[in-house]
């Protein structure tokens, strides 16, 4: 069976805000199956925002697992991410899941992979998915050359990615939190 694929998720931290945004397109092969999927969500009573790229069902399973890790570790984002990554890598069922997660709270931003990696990005910027490199390049240029807010940077960079990547559309979901950095 052909895999659902493609998306763009982007996170930017700037001026006391952290923002994660993503597009809404779900593709299967060369067919758009859905244009308004919600790939960015609030977790842990709204204190954490998360986005996913990869298989939709896989991502929902990982969101549930991650939220239970947040509950278990009293909202400690890094600890919950490391515990999820360990489970994801070692559990026979979980390790078959194909997705990447971006997660952020007021203090940290992380990418979690099925290989057991928990990556803290440089320069307050992270992007995943088929259009991630386009969005990241656009956001980096906007961060370095404008005074735009984190939200505006995410909106503009996702728009640029959607203009380039065939697996990304302009139906965005954007979530924002106050940040300590």
Curated annotation (Swiss-Prot):
The keyword Lipid metabolism does not apply. One of its GO terms (biological process) is proteolysis involved in protein catabolic process. One of its GO terms (cellular component) is proteasome core complex. It catalyses: ATP-dependent cleavage of peptide bonds with broad specificity. Na(+) binds at residues 162, 165, 168. A double ring-shaped homohexamer of HslV is capped on each side by a ring-shaped HslU homohexamer. The assembly of the HslU/HslV complex is dependent on binding of ATP. HAMAP family: HslV (MF_00248). This is ATP-dependent protease subunit HslV. It comes from Coxiella burnetii (strain Dugway 5J108-111).
């Amino acid at each position: 069976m052909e895999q659902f694929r493609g998306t763009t998720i982007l996170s930017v931290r700037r001026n006391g805000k952290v923002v994660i945004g993503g597009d809404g397109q779900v593709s299967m092969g060369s067919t758009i199956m859905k244009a308004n999927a919600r790939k960015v969500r609030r977790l842990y009573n709204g204190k954490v925002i998360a986005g996913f790229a990869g298989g939709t069902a896989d991502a929902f399973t990982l969101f549930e697992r991650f939220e239970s890790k947040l509950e278990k570790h009293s909202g400690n984002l890094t600890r919950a991410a490391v515990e999820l990554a360990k489970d994801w890598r070692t559990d026979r069922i979980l390790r078959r899941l194909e997705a990447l997660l971006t997660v952020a709270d007021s203090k940290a931003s992380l990418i979690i992979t099925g290989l057991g990696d928990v990556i803290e990005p440089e320069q307050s910027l992270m992007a995943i998915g088929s259009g991630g490199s386009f969005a990241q390049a656009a956001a980096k240029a906007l961060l370095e050359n404008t005074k735009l807010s984190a939200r505006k940077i995410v909106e503009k960079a996702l728009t640029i990615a959607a203009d380039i990547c065939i697996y990304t559309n302009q139906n965005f979901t954007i979530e924002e939190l106050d940040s300590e950095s």
